[in-house]
Amino acid sequence: MFGGVGPFCIIIGKKSSVDKIFSIDINPDAYKLLVKNIQINKVGDIINPILGDSKNIVPSSLLGLADRIIMPLPENSFEYIEAALSGIKNSGGIIHLYSHIYIDELDSKINLIMKRIESQDKSCKILSSNIVKNIGPGWGQVVFDIQIK
């Protein structure tokens, strides 16, 4: 989700042994550059680029297919949790959710994420939460690694 020009999917496609990667972005310019990036890096047999809104694409076309979903749009990832959950396999998987938060509110954000997921009749466990970068005094970009069961 929020694949952009492919910074995550290209590296994963080149360095891991996954069978298929779906990279979705709503921005047509990013999508064009993603397609070019896939060609340059010779990962077209692994990465399937999709132009569209993840909120619509995942529940309609990628239902229950993913072992792992990366959500690197810290401004809005929280709004897309339901779509991400619909993409995770019934047997479970991992969601990497990026968010901008006040660092001293980390525990309350974790509780909010867990409640949101559990409201969708899924169980979850926060495997880790890491500050990716500081973006202001007491304000940071954090990635939450969430196991969905």
Predicted regions and their residues:
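Rossmann-like S-adenosyl-L-methionine
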Residues: 1-149
